[in-house]
């Protein structure tokens, strides 16, 4: 998720912001959550260069869904993924990346269209307890206010931390109205587009994704569908600023077109 220490900074009105709004950095974690148990988030992968820097979601044996800002400037030959493990640095299996597909209209300024696909060189072995694909929603589908979604990853456990947990964490959060979220972020100079969804505890804060969780899954608990991708926010779990996620339902046609190539 993009936060104060993220790589991509929206230089929106420097004098009006105490802290800049940023895409979730490649080193974020879950705030206010708990350690994931075996089988709870089997679709989660760790995207790695020399080590973990972003999350991703298993779509099938060859394809991974992640955030565009995670792969911005990256070269496929230097990337790998680890799957089938609750730890980002050990266990499971590592596979090399064959190709990166970043959305053509990704905007690093507004962080709109923050979605990318990764194709692997060799297939994953799925249908294991910690290695399963997730379902995609239909094109144009949207979340509803109050829907419960699960966010997972290896990001920082609190804002300002500089140490990644070795274990995967997860947290369940509620979807916040897009209109309400936009009003909150307008004051900070940012815009919530129709390609974004928001989630968290607006009144009290305390639960959110953070640096290092970027690119990871936001899954509807009831349907087990991937409805969001960890994208950006103002700090981590701050009161009055829910996390912002890519709305996957806006991009199903794009996903299908890339996977059919």
Swiss-Prot record:
It is found in: Secreted. The active site is at residues 69, 114, 214. Pfam families: Trypsin. Keywords: Allergen, Disulfide bond, Hydrolase, Protease, Secreted, Serine protease, Signal, Zymogen. GO terms for cellular component: extracellular region. The record marks 208 as: Required for specificity. Residues 19-29 form a propeptide. SMART domains: Tryp_SPc. GO terms for molecular function: serine-type endopeptidase activity. PANTHER family: ACROSIN-RELATED, HYALIN. This is Mite allergen Eur m 3. It comes from Euroglyphus maynei (Mayne's house dust mite). The gene is EURM3.
């Amino acid at each position: 998720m993009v936060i104060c220490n993220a790589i991509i900074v929206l230089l929106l009105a420097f004098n009006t912001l105490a802290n800049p709004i940023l895409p979730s950095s490649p080193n974020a974690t879950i705030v206010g959550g708990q350690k994931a148990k075996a089988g709870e988030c089997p679709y989660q992968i760790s995207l790695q260069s020399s080590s973990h820097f972003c999350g991703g979601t298993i779509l099938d044996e060859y394809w991974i869904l992640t955030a565009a800002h995670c792969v911005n400037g990256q070269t496929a030959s230097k990337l790998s993924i680890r799957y089938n493990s609750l730890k980002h640095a050990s266990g499971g299996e590592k596979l090399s990346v064959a190709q990166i597909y970043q959305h053509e209209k990704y905007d690093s300024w507004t962080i709109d269209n923050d979605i990318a696909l990764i194709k692997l060189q060799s297939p994953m072995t799925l249908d294991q307890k910690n290695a399963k694909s997730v379902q995609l929603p239909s094109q144009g589908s949207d979340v509803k206010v109050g829907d419960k979604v699960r966010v997972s990853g290896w990001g920082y456990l609190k804002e300002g931390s500089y140490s990644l947990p070795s274990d995967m964490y997860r947290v369940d959060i509620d979807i916040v109205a897009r209109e309400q979220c936009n009003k909150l972020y307008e004051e900070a100079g940012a815009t919530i587009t129709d390609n974004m969804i928001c989630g968290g505890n607006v009144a009290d804060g305390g639960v959110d994704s953070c640096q290092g969780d970027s690119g990871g899954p936001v899954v509807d608990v009831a349907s087990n569908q991937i409805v969001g991708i960890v994208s950006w926010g103002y700090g981590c779990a701050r009161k009055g600023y829910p996390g912002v996620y890519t709305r996957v339902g806006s991009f199903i046609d794009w996903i299908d077109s890339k996977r059919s190539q």
